[in-house]
Amino acid sequence: MAGLVCFLALVSSSAFAANWPANTLDDLTDIKEAISENHPGPVDPENPKFVDWLNDGYEAAEKLAKKAKTKADYERVLRQYVNGFRDGHLLLYPAKPENLIWPGFLTRSDGEGKTTVSFTSPLSSFLEGSKLVGCDGTKTSDLLEQRVFNVRTNKDIPHEKIVDSPHLFLVAQNDQTKPKTCSFLVNGKLTDLYLDWSAIDPETAESNVRKASGNHRPELGIQKIDGVWFISLPTFNFWGERAVKIQNLITELGDKKEALHKAEFVVFDVRGNDGGNSGWGDQIVAKLWGARTARNLETSKDQTVDWRVSEYNEQALREQAIRSADAGLTDASKFRIRVADDMRKSRINGTDLMLDEARPTGPGLPLQTPSPFQGKVYLLTDWYCASACLDFADNMRNLADVVHIGQPTSADSVYIDNVWKDLPSGEMKFSWSLKVYRNRLCANNIWYDPVIRWTGGEMEDEAVAQWVKTLAN
C-alpha cells in the first residue's frame, strides 16, 4: 500500500508539473480578457499604443507560455506581459505568501552601469561593497535586463531600475534558470563564487530588498528628532481593522497641531510610501491646514475623469464602498456608490467610457489661505512614492508654505483606482485600474523632482534631520 501511495504521489506531481504551460496560458488569457473588458486603456482614444501591446505583447507571451516548466517560468511570462504596458497600476501578486530563495546577498545598481553588493547575511559579509561582474558567462547588465527590468521595471521611469535591481538575487524556489556561479571584484581582486541558495520568507525578503535599495521606511507616527518634527507616513494602505492606526495618527495631529504650527522644522515624511487610499492624505491636510484649504486644493485641480464601464467594475465599486464605510471614510463610500449608479446607467446605454460629470473639470480658485505654520515645512519623498502618495504630493506641492525635498518620486500612468480578481490557476491575483485622468497634475509616467535633492548616502532619520536644519541657511 505504501508503494502505491508513493506511485500516486509521483503521478500527481508529474501531472501537476506538466500543467504549467496550460496554467500559464489560462492565466495569460484571463489577464488579456480582464483588461479588454474592464480597463480604460483598450477604449482610450488618447492611447493607441495600449491596444498594440495588448495584442502584440500577448502573442509574444503566448509563445513563451507554451515553454513554461516551473512556477518561476509561469510568473516570468505573466509579469513580462503585464510590465510591457508601462502602467504601474497593472499589478500581479501571489495569491498566498510563498518562500523565495537567495544566496545570502543582494545587489543594487546605481543607474550608471555599476552594480554592487549592498546587503548581506553575516556569512556573506565579505562581499559587502564588491562589484558584480557577471554570472555564468553573462554580464551584469544583461542579467538585470533579462531577470529584473523586463519583468518588473517601468522603462519610462529610469530611476525605478535602482529600486528594482535588488530583486536580481531573489528568486522562486523552483527557478531552474537562477545563476550558479558569479564573479565579483572584491577589494580589487576578481573572485568567482559558487552560489549557495537558501530559503527566505516573504516578510524578510521584502525587508532585505528595502535595505539593499537604500530605502529607509519609517514607522507610522509623529516624532521629534534633533529638533525636527517628522510626520511619518510610510503608506496610505489602511483598510478594515488597520484603519484605526491612521485614524489615531490623525487624532494625534489634532492634539499636537499647536506645537507643530509653532515648530521651527516640520517634515511630512513619505519615504517608502507606494500608495493606498488618498483620502487619508486629504484628511491630514484638512487637520493641519483646515477644511477650507483642503476644499480649495480639491477644486483647484482639473479632475476630468473617464471611468471604464463594465459589470465587473460596477460591482467592485459597490464592494469598495462597503469597505470605505467600514474604515470610517464616509465621503469615499458615498462617492463610489454614486459612480457605480452612474456606471449602471451608462452600461445600459452601451457606453464604454463614462465622463464623471460630478467632478471638477477645470482649474478653480487659486489657493489664498494663509499658512498656519510659523517655521519651515517640507515634503520628503524617495523613489517609492506612487499612486496615493503622488496624490498627496499633488496637494502638498501646491501649498505655498511647503518645500519638496529628497529624491525624485516614482510615477503613475494616467490610469488609477484599482480593483482585483483571482486568476484561474489560483496562483496569482491580478489588479487593474477603473478610470483615466485626462489632465492630472502629474502627467503620464512623469515623476516629481524635489526642489532640493538629497545629497546622497543613506537617507537615515538622523542624517535627514541634520540636513533639514541646513536648508534654512
Can you say where each PLM-predicted feature lies in the sequence?
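Flexible, glycine-rich surface segments
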Residues: 338, 342-408, 414-417
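Low-complexity, Gly/Ser/Thr/Pro-rich intrinsically disordered linker/tail segments
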Residues: 439-473
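Flexible, low-complexity junctional segments that flank or bridge functional domains
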Residues: 17-317, 322, 376-378, 391, ...
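N-terminal signal peptide c-region/cleavage motif recognized by signal peptidases
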Residues: 12-14
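Low-complexity, serine/threonine/proline-enriched polar segments
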Residues: 299-353
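Bacterial N-terminal signal peptides that target proteins for export
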Residues: 1-4
